[in-house]
Amino acid sequence: MIVSGLSGSGKSVALKTFEDLDYYCSDNLPVELLPDFVRSRLRGNPLGDQRLAVGIDVRSRSDLTQLAQWRQAAQEYGIEARLLFFEASDEALLKRYADTRRRHPLSQLGLALPEAITRERELTAPLRAQADAIIDTSALNVHQLRRRVVTEFALGNSDRLSLLFESFAYKRGVPAEADFVFDARVLPNPHWDPELRPLTGRDAGVRDYLDKEPDVIRYSAQIVDLLDTWLPRLRNDTRSYVTIAFGCTGGKHRSVYLAERMARHAREQGWPEVATFHREQD
């Protein structure tokens, strides 16, 4: 697993999570040293079943464009190197640097923080372009990010397609990593029922309310039809992860309900790796 992205976006949290899950981790490794590093680890483990996670970013001052060539060569030898790219909005990164008072790695070039962030986006663009998954952490805290890594990536089997059903609030932005986005704001809102307002889409009261609504029944059936038609096509693609996101006003009732309902349907259809993530609740 190759972990890359913008400074302050959560790469260190991701690597620590992989380490806790028994990955052998190395951070800030120059791209040109990656082949020797992998070979040395495999020689020390003849069975070849050791899980590795490597952090690569602008701190190494490497030619990041070399990574694509190495991944292609590694694949020819039966080594799958998946690339996760972490990013966040400028606003989120600026706030995190203000809170931690850390220096940006590119500040040594004499750049102000906003300029350093912009320059880093340019330098890491080749990595972002070839990423297997892009994770926007702007709206995530440390605990949410850790849970996200565990549920969507760390427990996955590399030869199977992992599905993540995510709920979110539109007022906090659409998840940048979403492959499919469905707007649940067209559905009746349990928020206006005083008894249902404090509940979430995971509670029986909200489920019972929405299960009876004709628009919900029709909308859910149309989503099921679309996903049942197209998700199997992606199984034969080179991608390892698919994120299906559902949004509503507050990310509490309708979006959570749909994410849970579709995840349940996916499991019933035999998909082996299905996870849910409720951005505004978890």
Swiss-Prot record:
Record-linked InterPro entries: P-loop_NTPase, RapZ-like, RapZ-like_N, RapZ_C
Residues reported to bind GTP: 57-60
GO molecular function: ATP binding; GTP binding; molecular adaptor activity
Source organism, top-level taxon: Bacteria
Function recorded in the entry: Displays ATPase and GTPase activities.
Name this protein carries in UniProt: Nucleotide-binding protein XCC2806
Species of the source: Xanthomonas campestris pv. campestris (strain ATCC 33913 / DSM 3586 / NCPPB 528 / LMG 568 / P 25)
Short name of one Pfam family: PapZ_C
Similarity field: Belongs to the RapZ-like family.
Entry keywords, A to Z: ATP-binding, GTP-binding, Nucleotide-binding
Cross-referenced NCBIfam families: PRK05416.1
Classification via SUPFAM superfamilies: P-loop containing nucleoside triphosphate hydrolases (SSF52540)
Binding site for ATP: 5-12
